[in-house]
C-alpha cells in the first residue's frame, strides 16, 4: 500500500507585477461559430421504452418488476395474451430514451437517440429498441424511436471473473427517431433577431453589433444591431429585408472575439486547461514530493512436529520513505508559454501542477480566473 503526501512550498513571491503587457494575438471567427439564434434553440425529448434481444444481460423481473409489467402491456397491445405465464428470461431491459429536437426540424427527418438502462441489466449490447414515443415538456409526442442500440463498452463474465470496459448500460440509436410533429416556429414573422453568445463577453458583443451595423449601413442605409448585454445582441429587421437571407449574411460576418482569462482544473481527472490570455506575475515556486511506502509481509510460524503448538502469523512491516523534487523554478514572463515552461522545469505531474496553480492564485500572481470542476 502506498500513501502519498505532497506538499507545496512557495519560496518567494516577487511583489512587482509586469506592467506593459503586449496584447494577445487576435482571434477571428464567424458569428455563426460564436453565437446562436434565440429562436433556433434545441428542445429536449424523453420517453420510456424496452430493449429486446439481449443475451441474458437484461433486467431480472424480481429486481425490476416494472420491466415485466411493461412487457406484458406491450404484448397485450399487440393482441398477445399473457395470462398465466411467467418468464424468467433476461433478454429484455427497460430504458429511458432521450433526444434533442433540433430547431426547424420537419416531419419525416431523423434524429439520434440515447438509451439508458433503468433496471439491473448488465449490458444493452446486441439489443433492439422497440417503438417508443418521445414527448416534449408540453406532453405532446414529437418523435417515435426504434432501432438497434449501439453500445461502445463490452463485458465478459465467467464463474470467477468479470471483465468490463466502458459503459455497457447506455448506448445510442443513430437516426433511430423519426420526427412526427414540428415545433411551432414564428421565425418568418419575427421583427427582431436575437443572437446569444455561447461565451458571454461585453467586448465580443459590442464588436458583433459594430460589424452588423457596418454591414447594415452599407446594405440598408442604417444601423440595425444593439448589444443588450454581454450575451445578447438584438438585430431589428429592415423593412425590405428577407429574414432568412438577412440571417445567412449576418452569420458569415467575421468578428474578433475576446474571452476572459481562465484556468480550468478538473481535480478528479487531473485535466488542466490554460487559456492563451493568462498572465503570471514573476514568482518563484518550489515543489517537492514525499512518498511513504508501507509493505506488510506477514510470516507464518509452524510448530515443531508432534508438538501441541498451533500455527501462528507474525506480522512484519517495512516502511520506506523517499523525497523527490524540491527544485526552485522562477516563473518570470507574461505569456502562456512561459508559465508552461516554468512548470515543466520543476518536473511535476498534473496533480502537482494543480497544487502549484492554486498556490500561485492564492499568492495573487495568477492574473486569471481559476475554475475548479
Curated annotation (Swiss-Prot):
Subunit structure of this chain's protein: The basal body constitutes a major portion of the flagellar organelle and consists of four rings (L,P,S, and M) mounted on a central rod.
A Gene Ontology molecular function term of the record = structural molecule activity
Compartments, as annotated in UniProt? Periplasm; Bacterial flagellum basal body
Q: Name one GO cellular component term.
A: bacterial-type flagellum basal body, distal rod, P ring
Q: Which residues form the signal peptide?
A: 1-26
Tell me which PANTHER family the record gives: FLAGELLAR P-RING PERIPLASMIC PROTEIN FLGI, FLAGELLAR P-RING PROTEIN
Q: What does this protein do?
A: Assembles around the rod to form the L-ring and probably protects the motor/basal body from shearing forces during rotation.
Q: Which UniProt keywords apply?
A: Bacterial flagellum, Periplasm, Signal
Query: Which Gene Ontology BP terms does the record give?
Result: bacterial-type flagellum-dependent cell motility
Q: Which InterPro entries match?
A: Flag_FlgI
Q: Which domain of life is it from?
A: Bacteria
Q: Which family does it belong to?
A: Belongs to the FlgI family.
Q: Which Pfam families match?
A: FlgI (PF02119)
UniProt-recorded name of the protein: Flagellar P-ring protein
Amino acid at each position: 500500500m502506498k500513501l502519498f503526501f505532497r506538499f507545496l512550498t512557495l519560496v518567494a513571491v516577487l511583489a512587482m507585477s509586469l506592467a506593459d503587457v503586449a496584447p494577445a494575438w487576435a482571434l477571428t471567427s464567424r458569428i455563426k461559430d460564436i453565437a446562436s439564434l434565440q429562436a433556433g434553440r434545441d428542445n429536449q425529448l424523453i420517453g420510456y421504452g424496452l430493449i429486446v434481444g439481449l443475451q441474458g444481460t437484461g433486467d431480472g423481473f424480481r429486481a425490476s418488476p416494472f420491466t415485466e409489467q411493461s412487457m406484458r402491456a406491450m404484448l397485450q397491445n399487440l393482441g398477445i395474451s399473457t395470462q398465466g405465464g411467467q418468464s424468467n428470461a433476461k433478454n429484455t431491459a427497460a430504458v429511458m430514451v432521450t433526444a434533442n429536437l433540433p430547431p426547424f426540424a420537419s416531419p419525416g427527418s431523423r434524429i439520434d437517440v440515447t438509451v439508458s438502462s433503468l433496471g439491473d441489466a448488465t449490458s444493452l449490447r446486441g439489443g433492439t429498441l422497440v417503438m417508443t414515443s418521445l414527448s416534449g415538456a408540453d406532453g405532446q409526442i414529437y418523435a417515435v424511436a426504434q432501432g438497434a442500440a449501439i453500445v461502445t463498452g463490452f463485458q465478459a463474465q465467467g464463474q470467477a471473473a468479470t471483465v468490463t470496459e466502458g459503459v455497457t448500460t447506455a448506448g445510442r440509436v443513430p437516426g433511430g427517431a423519426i420526427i412526427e410533429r414540428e415545433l411551432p416556429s414564428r421565425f418568418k414573422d419575427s421583427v427582431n433577431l436575437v443572437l446569444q453568445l455561447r461565451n458571454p463577453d461585453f467586448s465580443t458583443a459590442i464588436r458583433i453589433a459594430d460589424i452588423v451595423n457596418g454591414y447594415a449601413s452599407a446594405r440598408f442605409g442604417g444601423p440595425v444591431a444593439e448589444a443588450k448585454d454581454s450575451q445578447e445582441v438584438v438585430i431589428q429587421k429592415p423593412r425590405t429585408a428577407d429574414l432568412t437571407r438577412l440571417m445567412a449574411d449576418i452569420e458569415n460576418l467575421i468578428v474578433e472575439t475576446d474571452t476572459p482569462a481562465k484556468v480550468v482544473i478538473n481535480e478528479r481527472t487531473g485535466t488542466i486547461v490554460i487559456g492563451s490570455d493568462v498572465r503570471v506575475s514573476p514568482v518563484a515556486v518550489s515543489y517537492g514530493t514525499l512518498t511513504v511506502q508501507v509493505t506488510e509481509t506477514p510470516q507464518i510460524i509452524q510448530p515443531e512436529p508432534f508438538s501441541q503448538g498451533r500455527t501462528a502469523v507474525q506480522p512484519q512491516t517495512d516502511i520506506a520513505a523517499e523525497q523527490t523534487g524540491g527544485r526552485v523554478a522562477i516563473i518570470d514572463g507574461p505569456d502562456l508559454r512561459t508559465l508552461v515552461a516554468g512548470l515543466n522545469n520543476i518536473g511535476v505531474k498534473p496533480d502537482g501542477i494543480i497544487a502549484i496553480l492554486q498556490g500561485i492564485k492564492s499568492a495573487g500572481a495568477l492574473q486569471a480566473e481559476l475554475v475548479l470542476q
